[in-house]
Regions:
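Small-residue-enriched alpha-helical segments and adjacent helix-cap loops
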Residues: 1-133
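Mobile "lid/hinge" segments at catalytic clefts and subdomain interfaces of large enzymes
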Residues: 118-170
Length: 170
């Protein structure tokens, strides 16, 4: 997640390059474009200086989450917090994350799919779990295919919100 102040710093830095420089993707990434190659080293140095991680395994920066119950009235689960916890657990694991470059992980705090979980390799969407009491949990979906012969991810299980980070490394 990028803060307001960080976005202002980026905007100030790229302003001299013109109006057609920044794009935001459906995967919640910021793309800087139309920057002459002779300035790319400066861009890299600047982003590193303001704390934008560029050397982490792609999977860690490829986890998309909707805003969830933090600010959404429909949210059941804290999806942004779940994404942050997943990044932390995966980053500390011994898993070969560099081999998982093309894997997408999407999280929605409720069934509404704002986090686009149905279009991901591994997706989660919030639900109310019930045992002896109600608790926040996630449905697990997997196997979406984008492109030729597209297919939506299919429901494969569920996990409590508390156990979600551990689930990602098991």
């Amino acid at each position: 997640n990028v803060t307001y102040n960080t976005l202002i710093k980026i905007a100030d830095f790229i302003a001299p390059f013109g109006d057609d420089v920044v794009r935001f993707s459906m995967r919640q990434n910021i793309h800087l474009r139309n920057i002459p190659s002779k300035y790319l080293g400066n861009v890299f140095t600047f982003l590193t200086k303001i704390g934008i991680t560029t050397n982490a395994p792609l999977l860690l920066n490829n986890i998309v989450a909707c805003t969830g119950a933090d600010t959404c009235r429909l949210g059941i689960c804290l999806s942004k917090g779940a994404g942050k916890a997943m990044r932390s657990v995966l980053g500390k694991s011994d898993l070969p994350l560099d081999d998982l470059k093309e894997i997408t992980v999407n999280i929605s705090g409720c069934p509404n799919s704002c986090g686009q979980q149905a279009a991901s390799d591994l997706g989660f969407y919030g639900k109310v779990g019930r045992s002896h009491r109600m608790y926040p949990a996630y449905h697990i979906v997997a196997g979406a295919k984008i492109g030729i012969n597209p297919k939506l991810a299919e429901l494969v299980g569920e996990v409590s919100a508390r156990d979600l980070p551990k689930f990602t490394i098991d």
